Amino acid sequence: MKFTALAKATLALGILTTGTLTTEVHSGHAKQNQKSVNKHDKEALYRYYTGKTMEMKNISALKHGKNNLRFKFRGIKIQVLLPGNDKSKFQQRSYEGLDVFFVQEKRDKHDIFYTVGGVIQNNKTSGVVSAPILNISKEKGEDAFVKGYPYYIKKEKITLKELDYKLRKHLIEKYGLYKTISKDGRVKISLKDGSFYNLDLRSKLKFKYMGEVIESKQIKDIEVNLK
C-alpha cells in the first residue's frame, strides 16, 4: 500500500493530524463547530495513544516494494511503511535482527496489519540504559503543578515514534492528558549535542518522523508543558 493510501485510511480515526478548522459560517456556528471538532480530536488522540501496541523483537523481514517491510509475527502478517529517512536506510532485500514498535494504523481485507516506522536494529542490552530527567509542568488553573523525576529508557536506541507514544501514554495514565487535562501542550526532547525534538500534543506524530532513531544515552532531558 502506498503512503498516501495509508495516510487516507487513518482519517477514520477522526481529525487526528490537525487541531485547526477552516470555516466561513457565522461566528456562533463557528465556535460550536470548533468545540465539536476539538472534542472529537481529543477523543481520537486518546483512543490512539491508549490502543494496543506490540514490541516485536529480533524480527526477520523482507523488503516489499520501495518503502515497505513485510514479515510474520506469531502468525500475523505485518507490513511496515518506511517513512522519511528509513527509505534510504533499508535498501537490502532481506533483514535479520530487527526490533519493531507496532501500533496498528490499518487492517485490510487480506488480514495484513499495517504500521508506520518504529524499526531499529535489535537492542543487545537489558535493563535501564538511560534515565533523563522528565520535567512536567501545568502553569495555570487550580490544578497547576511542577514535577521532575527520572524517565527510564531500556533501549540503546529508540525511535521517536516509540518515545512519543510512551510519553503520551504516561501523561494519560498519570496526569489525565486527553481526559481531564486539555490536549494543548508541548514536549521538548533535548539532546546533549544541543539539538532537540518538539512534539505538539494537539496532534498525532506525523508519519515522516516515525522512523527517526535516537541514541537514548544522548537524551539530556525531556520538558512537558501542559495547558
From Swiss-Prot:
InterPro entries xref list: Enterotoxin (IPR008992), SSL_OB (IPR015282), Staph/Strept_toxin_CS (IPR006126), Staph_exotoxin (IPR008375), SuperAg_toxin_C (IPR016091), Superantigen_bac (IPR013307), Toxin_b-grasp_Staph/Strep (IPR006123)
Positions of disulphide bridges: none
Keywords: Secreted, Signal, Virulence
Protein task: Plays a role in the inhibition of host complement activation via the classical pathway by interacting with the Fc region of human IgG and thereby interfering with the IgG/C1q interaction. Also inhibits the penultimate step of plasma clotting by interacting with prothrombin/F2 and coagulation factor X/F12. Does not affect the protease activity of thrombin but interferes with the conversion of prothrombin to thrombin. Interacts with human receptor CXCR4 and specifically inhibits CXCL12-induced calcium mobilization and cell migration.
Chief location bin: secreted
NCBIfam families: PRK13038.1
Name the UniProt record assigns to this protein: Staphylococcal superantigen-like 10
Species this chain originates from: Staphylococcus aureus (strain NCTC 8325 / PS 47)
N-terminal signal peptide: 1-30
Gene encoding the protein: ssl10
The family this protein is said to belong to: Belongs to the staphylococcal/streptococcal toxin family.
Subcellular location: Secreted
